[in-house]
Amino acid sequence: MIDLKEVKERMGKVSKAFQNELINIRAGRANPNILNKIQVEYYGAPTPLNQLASVQIPEARVLLITPYDKTSLKAIEQAIFASDLGLTPQNDGSAIRLIIPQLTEDSRKELVKQVKAEAEKAKVAARNTRHDFMSDLKKDNDLSEDSRHRTEDDIQKATDLEIKDIDRIADIKEKELMEI
């Protein structure tokens, strides 16, 4: 027997993962979440940046990274250089400033393409989840034909809702990116 609660829960995880991916797409404004994936080599172990420093937003397009331990400043700077952020850290000896450049029209369009690609991946993940549940349903011989069709309809409705949610989230991000 398929639990619809589990279907909705797994579908919800798809849009949550999609939202987390979109956080990493910068929109010309300072957002500390763009630093979430940065690992700093600290005493020989890769350590998340947010465990080594506080990140503040003093201005709309500036991130200020203040390490808890000043000796980690150079390692943090190197990790930012090595990342795929495309930002140049400015080290003033006690903190690092990251200036987020204004997006050009071309870079905005490129980021919108990236959002659409991520949205498509999320939709595929939702459809794969639907496929998994439909396969499980076909294997369940204890269900009557009516129950099976009703459950298939419910799974399809959950998938359709998830895809609508993904489209809504993508539209919001696209508008944010195209905003000047």
From Swiss-Prot:
The keyword Iron does not apply. Residues 135-156 are annotated as: Disordered. GO terms for cellular component: cytoplasm. SUPFAM superfamilies: Ribosome recycling factor, RRF. Keywords: Cytoplasm, Protein biosynthesis. Its main location: cytoplasm. NCBIfam families: frr. One of its GO terms (biological process) is translational termination. Responsible for the release of ribosomes from messenger RNA at the termination of protein biosynthesis. May increase the efficiency of translation by recycling ribosomes from one round of translation to another. InterPro entries: Ribosome_recyc_fac, Ribosome_recyc_fac_dom, RRF_sf. One of its GO terms (molecular function) is ribosomal large subunit binding. The gene is frr. Pfam families: RRF (PF01765). Transmembrane segments: none annotated. This is Ribosome-recycling factor. CDD domains: RRF. It is found in: Cytoplasm. Belongs to the RRF family.
